[in-house]
Curated annotation (Swiss-Prot):
Pfam families: NikR_C (PF08753), RHH_1 (PF01402). This is Putative nickel-responsive regulator. GO terms for molecular function: DNA binding; DNA-binding transcription factor activity; nickel cation binding. Transcriptional regulator. SUPFAM superfamilies: ACT-like, Ribbon-helix-helix. GO terms for biological process: response to nickel cation. Binds 1 nickel ion per subunit. Its cofactor is Ni(2+). Ni(2+) binds at residues 74, 85, 87, 93. Keywords: DNA-binding, Metal-binding, Nickel, Transcription, Transcription regulation. The lineage of its organism: Archaea, Thermoproteota, Thermoprotei, Sulfolobales, Sulfolobaceae. Belongs to the transcriptional regulatory CopG/NikR family. It comes from Saccharolobus islandicus (strain L.S.2.15 / Lassen #1) (Sulfolobus islandicus). It comes from the Archaea.
Length: 133
């Protein structure tokens, strides 16, 4: 793998947190942490029309949200690949929705889901396909 060396400055407290994290987790390669963090940041802020993949993580009260949630999922059936549903307790559920499509469409879906009454959390984690470098 071809790589460029760069230098960064961190506030002392952030640097100490990083070093503590590396020590606790036994991570041998500090560069890998920055590569992953930078890819995540760039993915979150990238614009474009290419097809991307992602997971929408929902936490919700099923008594309030189930009907509207199902309705919206049917509207976006071309973008939803699969869902995983977990029961937390008698009322709360967690749902992980695997999605595929243009970023703008997935953000729109996440925003619509987040507006449903009873949705406590709606978070989109996106991933652009990368060639291995």
């Amino acid at each position: 793998m071809s790589a460029e060396k760069i230098s960064i400055s961190l506030p002392k407290e952030l640097y100490r947190e990083l070093e503590d994290f590396i020590t606790r987790k036994g991570i041998p390669d500090r560069s890998k942490i920055f590569q992953i963090a930078l890819r995540n940041y760039l993915d979150e802020n990238r614009e474009g029309t290419e097809i991307i993949y992602g997971i929408i993580n929902l936490v919700y009260d099923h008594e309030e949200a189930s009907e509207a949630l199902t309705e919206i999922q049917h509207e976006y059936k071309d973008n939803i690949i699969s869902t995983l549903h977990l029961h937390v307790n008698e009322r709360l559920c967690i749902e992980a929705i695997a999605v595929k499509g243009e970023k703008s469409k997935l953000v729109e879906l996440n925003n619509r889901l987040g507006q449903i009454r009873g949705i406590l959390k709606a978070r989109l984690l996106i991933s652009f396909p990368y060639e291995k470098t």
